[in-house]
């Protein structure tokens, strides 16, 4: 009996388009949801990333909400990824913050 080929599941790649760094500054408020603290990133570091972002991307998705990926250094200089939802074109709700992953780093370097 011939052996069947193993199917390898590919992880989905992030699809995004770059945004100007001044994009985050247009929000009147930045709120942080409790899920953003899941990976141990502090409130101060989340605000530091938003204020000193090096790259900002709008993530492509099927939902109606605008999801924004913000990449920048924390207070110690480590790169973090922060994801926020735009709410009513006025505020940004941060829902995710963690040390930058390899897949996101590839996106930044343009190798995706």
Region annotations inferred by a language model:
Residues 1-112:
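Ribonuclease/tRNase effector modules and their secretory precursors
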